Every structure is written in structure tokens, then in C-alpha cells.
Regions:
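Beta-propeller domains
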Residues: 1-746
Length: 746
């Protein structure tokens, strides 16, 4: 069955993105005493090419990935392998979060892999409805997975946050994503143990996504937060956000309204029973009239609330790991609520400030409620997408909150605003802010819209892609060269934040003395070949200086098969375009390789006044057809320096290694290539995302815990009897049917 892609010349050109990212294993590996549901023991990884593991490796690397859903299409010859985005509509970041832990604590025995799906209460609801109660079933809707009766899944598939509280011996670990409460996991068993904060502590993204008119509230509401909360080990505080907004843009309502109309027409043409069976109506005429009037008032009130500009909100949340969460609503100086137009994918923290940003991971209503993935809607959906969709905002809007304002006796705090040219998804902050100087490290994702993904409607029926499967679900590629930025904000003025200094790198002209920004030529012009699509980052934790000296970045590069004409047209007139759009098209067709680099940030005291403090000092360019992702810094045991561990994809899942490997680099010498490569026939990643490293793991001993039944009971008791019984049978006991024959309740 297996065949090597080396013999397939279709995959030799640089523009062919590795198809191995399209499949993923949902198998859990682990000790049975830690995870009774584990199918196999921890996986001992193999070392390629007879090389040795670096002796200085230590601790445990955690990587997270979306791994499809309970109803994802599986491979014919192996039901454990699924193709999460094969429907042509679902993005790769819609799926259950799988935690991968690589143990480097006993190198004499080898490197072992333990995996586990983050099983929140809504996971058990998803599994049970898929097998046993299809009228409640969850379905993929863009970035979300939603049930019309139960609400929105919290899939926890994006990031981690280690937390070391002073009173505890071991680090605790949060698992996160953008649209759900963070959860704490046990670092040894990998079980998702408890959410942070009670459900009632978190405000829904919008009233309509917590409770539809004329229906009881969803048991699982949509909560928007940050995939990258922060922890201050000096004060023992975790910080995150809870945000939401009004649905006040009329055009964004076109899609759900139109599809509601199409659905109504279908139901008239093909009537069928749906939903809950209603008891015979015993009301008299006046009771019915009063009920209709009450429902009309309720409907109008719900719509007014949903479109009210005061539905915009941002809360800063703090938590000490043992008590209830604290929260403060953030406003402008005039008292109006802050409106986040895209998302708050990442926040920052310094010793005196919380840094909030409207990040370039746009979260639009047309993505929340997209079309059904049915062929009959395809042309309408394509027309609507072109009409409704918009590019991400070209600037980074930042809000600064002073930590001393976060007092227990106040409910609102004022933020000061500053706008930095060019958009950003990921950024880091120096912890130290001497003289109220805040240093930000931004990866400007110039004309790179990671919230857009490859869909079936992006291609005509005649496009067979050279016989290769389309990259459905994959994020689209960059449409301009990206810039890496370092900014110093002056926060001394009580009213206004100013940009005191800005440094940028990324365009070849900025780096002529820099040998790691060599030429990529188009029409005789030279551009840096490294800074195309800054994806994920790594760094050494807690530098003694309190500021970053080196940040490691993985870059996507440019690939012809994750280029779409719709995306190109949307960003053709990008505000800060550095490279002409037509030349970007040519560069993408030729291909720019994925790479891993080290960006050095010089101390300002060592520079002349106009000298750029940013320099690419080391880089590794992956071979044709290889894609590197999810770098993680691991400090070297018993010495200085360290290693970069990352995931590398190539070829297809039909290779003996599934096209998935773990590469280990010397962090001080990326250019020399990997020290060793790890693999296993059963190692099968989807697109991996963020990572973390812990020096040791241990059974969780913290007492903080929110019981599932007590958390949701106030919502469940408002539901019809069928849903109340469903929660008692499946969700509260964390019960998962293995097949349809397991649906009976003992």
C-alpha cells in the first residue's frame, strides 16, 4: 500500500505543498494508568540516518494540533487516520485539540511520545450526538463546530501557557484557543481537568450566539478569548481577555438570512420531522395571543441587543490559580466600550502594563455562520463570499492598560490607544519597561490572511491540480513580503502613547550587509527570501536581562497550490505593498522555500542612533517540498545554549513515515541543518500549531476544580427534557459511545 513520493515527479517542484498535512491520526498513546482510553503504549520514536540524539536534550516538549472531529472522513484501510478538511469547506484549525508530549528525560531509553485529545464536556456531547442523537448533532461551520440546539464546541487546539505558582512544586499547564475558555491539563496524564472560571463568569461573544430568540440559552455558548494568555511568575498572576461585539454590520447578515430562506423553501418542498416533539397545545385563543405578543417583544429585544453598539466589550481577566477569576471592563477615555473588529489572538504583559491588540486573525460573522457544505449552495456561496469578505485591517491597533488600575474595588479601567502601521497576528513584549518604555516585537503578516483558507469553491470543476489533491482547509499563502518589527512605546504621558522608536527588517534593502538575506530575483529585483509568512515562534524563557535577545521564527514561504485568485484580488491594492502584486504572483509560481531563522534584537545601548537593532543572524532553508513548523526552544542540560525542536512535513501520508518528522537543531547553528530526525510509522500529525517546554512533569496536585454538573446545570435546567436527560446520560459522566450499538443507557 505504501509508496515513496520520491518517485512521483509531481511532488518535486517547489510549489507543491506537502500533502501529508491533509491527514492526521486520532489515536491516543499513553500508559493505561494515566489514560484508560489510550489505544497503545507511549510511542518510542526512531532516529533517522543512524545519527545520535544530542546528549543535552532534556525535559518535555508539548505540541498541539487540530486533529479532526468525531465525524471526519477516515481512510479506507485505517479508520484511525482521518482527513479533516476533505469536505472542501472546513479549515484545518477546526478540530479537536490533540496534545503531543515528547519526553526527553531518559535519553538512554529513547524519546517517547504520549498523546491525548483535549476532551471538554462539549467533546462528549459531540461524540454522543454523532452516534446516538443525530437531531442534536454538531456540524462544522467555518472555524466553528456548532449544534443548533447545544451551541458551540470549545476545541482547545491552539496554544499552551505554563504557570509556576510560588506555593507549588510543579508547573501547571493551560491549553487554549481563541473561542473557548482555557482549560488546565494534567502534565502527566494529559487529561483536560478543569476550565478557568465558571461558565457564568464568561460573557458570550454576542447575545445571539448565547441564546437565539424564542429558544432557551445554549448550554455551550461562544466565548471569545485569547489563544495566548500571559503569566507573571513574579506576581503569580495569569492574564487573559474576554471580548465580544455587536452584529451591527447589515451586510454580514446577508448570508444567514439567505440560507435561512433557502432552508425554509427546502422544508416546504420536502417536509420532514425535525427537532423536539411538542406536546398538544391546550391554550385558548387569548393565551395564544398573549404568548405571541410576548414572543414578538422578546424577538425584537434580542435583535436590538445583538445589534446594539454597547454589545462591544473587552474584559481583562486575572487569575491566581486557586480563587475565582477577577475581571475589569476596558473602555476608551470617554467611557465608550472598546470594539475589537477582528480578534485578540495574542496579548502581552510587562511588569507594569497589559498590552491588548486587535490582531490580524479576523473573526467575522460570515465565517461564524457560513453556508452549508452542500453542492446546491456552491454558486450562491461563492457569490456571497466575494460580496461580503473583506481584507484584514492593514494596521495594528494596540490598547495599553496600566496594571495598577486593576484594583479589586473597580469594575472598569481605561485604556490608551496607539496604532502601528502594518498588521500583526503574533507579538511578544519585553517584561521590563524601564521609564515606562514598552518594547514590542511584532511579526507583520503583510497581506497574509491566515483567517482565509483553501475551499472547494476557489477552483473550477475543470481544475484537476495536476492530479494532486487540492489543499482544502489550508491557510492561503502570503501575498507580499512580511516585515519583522521592534517598537518602543513611550507610556509616560497619562493621555497618549507614542512610538518612541521603530525598527523593521524584511526587505532586502534593509539588510544588505546581512548574508542571511540573500537575493530572490524577479525581473532583476532582489527581495529577502526568508521573511515570507512568519508563522510561529520560539525563544528562551525568562532572559535575565528582562528583554528578548533572540527570537526564532518559522516561515511559510510561497507555494503555488495555496495561492487563490480571490485572495490575490482582495489584497492586490494592499496599503503597504512592498513588492508589486504581479511580481508576487511570479514569485509564488516559482516558489519560495519554507525556513527557520534566528532574529537577533540588539541592546539599544550597543547601537548608534540610527542603527537597525534587528538582524537575521542564522537561518536554515528547508529542501524543496519540505515545510517546517512549530519550533520550540529546549535549553541544553548542564550548559549554555540549547536546541530547536520542530515538526517537518514532506510528501504524502502514503510514505512509510507518513511524511511527518521531528527535527532537532542546534539553536546556535541553524544553518548547519538538523542534528537528528525522529520518526515512526504511527506518527501522523495534522498541521501543528503552538508549543511549550517543561523541565519536568507530574501528577496534578492543585485543588482548583470546577465540577462539570455544577458548571452547566444553571443552563441545562432551562432546556427541554431530552437535553436534560442527554447531559445526565453522556456529558456529566464523561461517557463516550464507541459505536451506535453503545447508545443504550445501563
Amino acid at each position: 500500500m505504501n509508496k515513496s513520493v520520491e518517485k512521483d515527479d509531481k511532488l518535486e517542484k517547489n510549489s507543491s505543498f506537502p500533502r501529508s498535512v491533509l491527514s492526521v491520526s486520532r489515536v491516543e498513546f499513553g500508559l493505561r494508568e494515566d489514560n484508560p482510553e489510550a489505544k497503545y503504549c507511549p510511542l518510542k520514536l526512531l532516529v533517522k540516518d543512524g545519527k545520535q540524539l544530542p546528549s543535552g536534550l532534556q525535559g518535555h516538549v508539548f505540541i498541539i494540533s487540530a486533529t479532526g472531529s468525531v465525524d471526519s472522513k477516515s481512510r479506507d484501510d485505517n479508520k484511525d487516520i482521518v482527513f479533516p478538511s476533505s469536505d472542501g469547506f472546513t479549515p484545518f484549525y477546526n478540530g479537536d485539540g490533540m496534545v503531543y508530549r515528547f519526553d526527553f528525560d531518559n535519553l538512554e531509553e529513547g524519546v517517547f511520545l504520549t498523546t491525548r485529545i483535549a476532551k471538554t464536556p462539549c467533546y462528549y456531547a459531540d461524540a454522543a450526538t454523532n452516534k446516538c442523537q443525530p437531531n442534536l448533532r454538531f456540524k462544522n461551520r467555518g472555524i466553528m463546530r456548532m449544534s443548533d440546539e447545544l451551541g458551540i464546541r470549545n476545541q482547545l487546539n491552539t496554544g499552551f501557557l505554563p504557570m509556576k505558582f510560588s506555593q507549588e512544586d510543579n508547573e501547571r499547564l493551560l491549553i487554549t484557543w481563541d473561542i473557548g475558555r482555557p482549560y488546565e491539563i494534567d502534565t502527566k496524564t494529559l487529561e483536560a481537568v478543569t476550565p478557568v472560571g465558571w461558565d457564568r463568569d464568561w460573557r458570550a461573544f454576542n447575545p445571539l450566539l448565547a441564546k437565539l430568540p424564542l429558544q432557551p440559552p445554549f448550554p455551550f455558548k461562544l466565548v471569545q478569548t485569547s489563544a495566548h494568555p500571559c503569566f507573571d511568575e513574579n506576581t503569580g498572576e495569569m492574564f487573559t481577555v474576554n471580548s465580544g461585539r455587536s452584529l451591527s454590520t447589515f451586510i454580514a447578515q446577508l448570508r444567514p438570512v439567505l440560507y435561512w430562506a433557502f432552508g425554509l423553501i427546502d422544508s416546504i418542498r420536502n417536509p420532514s420531522p425535525r427537532g423536539f416533539q411538542k406536546a398538544p397545545d391546550q391554550k385558548n385563543f387569548f393565551q395564544k395571543l398573549a404568548a405571541a405578543f410576548k414572543q414578538t417583544i422578546h424577538l425584537l429585544w434580542s435583535l436590538l441587543q445583538s445589534f446594539n453598539i454597547f454589545a462591544n466589550f473587552v474584559y481583562v481577566i486575572s487569575w491566581d490559580g486557586k480563587e475565582k477569576i477577577n475581571k475589569w471592563q476596558v473602555t476608551h477615555p470617554n467611557g465608550c466600550p472598546i470594539a475589537i473588529k477582528q480578534s485578540m489572538h495574542q496579548i502581552g504583559l510587562t511588569e507594569d502594563y497589559v498590552v491588548l491588540m486587535d490582531t490580524a486573525f479576523k473573526f467575522l460573522l460570515e465565517e461564524i455562520l457560513p453556508a452549508p457544505n452542500e453542492p446546491k449552495y456552491e454558486e450562491i456561496e461563492k457569490w456571497l463570499s466575494n460580496l461580503i469578505d473583506r481584507p484584514q485591517l492593514p494596521d495594528s491597533t494596540i490598547y495599553i492598560v496600566r496594571r495598577t488600575d486593576l484594583k479589586s474595588d473597580v469594575k472598569k479601567v481605561v485604556a490608551r490607544q496607539v496604532v502601528i502601521p502594518r498588521e500583526t497576528t503574533h507579538f511578544l513584549t519585553d517584561y521590563k519597561n524601564p521609564n515606562d518604555q514598552i518594547t514590542l516585537h511584532l511579526a507583520h503578516v503583510c497581506a497574509w490572511d491566515v483567517a482565509e483558507w483553501i475551499r472547494e469553491i476557489d477552483f473550477s470543476n475543470s481544475d484537476n491540480n495536476g492530479g494532486l489533491p487540492h489543499m482544502f482547509g489550508m491557510t492561503v499563502g502570503p501575498l507580499d513580503i512580511s516585515r519583522m518589527g521592534c517598537y518602543v512605546l513611550d507610556a509616560k504621558d497619562a493621555k497618549q502613547i507614542k512610538v518612541a522608536r521603530s525598527d523593521l527588517t524584511g526587505v532586502y534593502a534593509d539588510n544588505q550587509p546581512n548574508k542571511y538575506c540573500q537575493d530572490t530575483q524577479t525581473n532583476g529585483k532582489e527581495y529577502c527570501k526568508y521573511t515570507w509568512g512568519p508563522a510561529l515562534y520560539a525563544y528562551r524563557e525568562n532572559p535575565p536581562s528582562g528583554h528578548f535577545e533572540n527570537i526564532y521564527w518559522s516561515f511559510f514561504g510561497c507555494w503555488e497550490d495555496i495561492f487563490t485568485e480571490e485572495g490575490f484580488q482582495m489584497y492586490q491594492n494592499y496599503k503597504y505593498r512592498a513588492i508589486p502584486a504581479d511580481e508576487v504572483r511570479q514569485l509564488t509560481k516559482k516558489g519560495i522555500k519554507s525556513n527557520l531563522l534566528r532574529l537577533h534584537i540588539a541592546d539599544l545601548d550597543t547601537l548608534e542612533a540610527n542603527e537597525n537593532r534587528l538582524q537575521i543572524q542564522d537561518a536554515y532553508e528547508f529542501d524543496t517540498g519540505y515545510f517546517g513548523n512549530s519550533p520550540q526552544f529546549v535549553p541544553r542540560a548542564g550548559g549554555t545554549g540549547g536546541y530547536i525542536v520542530c515538526v517537518v512535513y514532506n510528501g504524502t501520508d502514503e510514505q512509510p513515515d507518513n511524511g511527518n518528522e521531528i527535527w532537532i537543531f542546534d539553536a546556535a547553528d541553524l544553518k548547519s541543518g538538523p542534528l537528528c530526525k525522529l520518526w515512526h510509522p504511527q506518527l501522523n500529525f495534522g498541521i501543528s500549531v503552538h508549543t511549550t517546554w517543561l523541565s519536568k512533569i507530574g501528577k496534578r496536585t492543585a485543588s482548583y476544580n470546577i465540577p462539570v454538573k455544577q458548571d452547566y446545570e444553571y443552563l441545562v435546567k432551562q432546556q427541554p427534557q431530552e437535553i436534560q436527560e442527554f447531559f445526565n446520560e453522556w456529558v456529566y459522566p464523561k461517557r463516550e459511545p464507541k459505536d451506535s450499538g453503545d447508545c443504550s443507557v445501563s
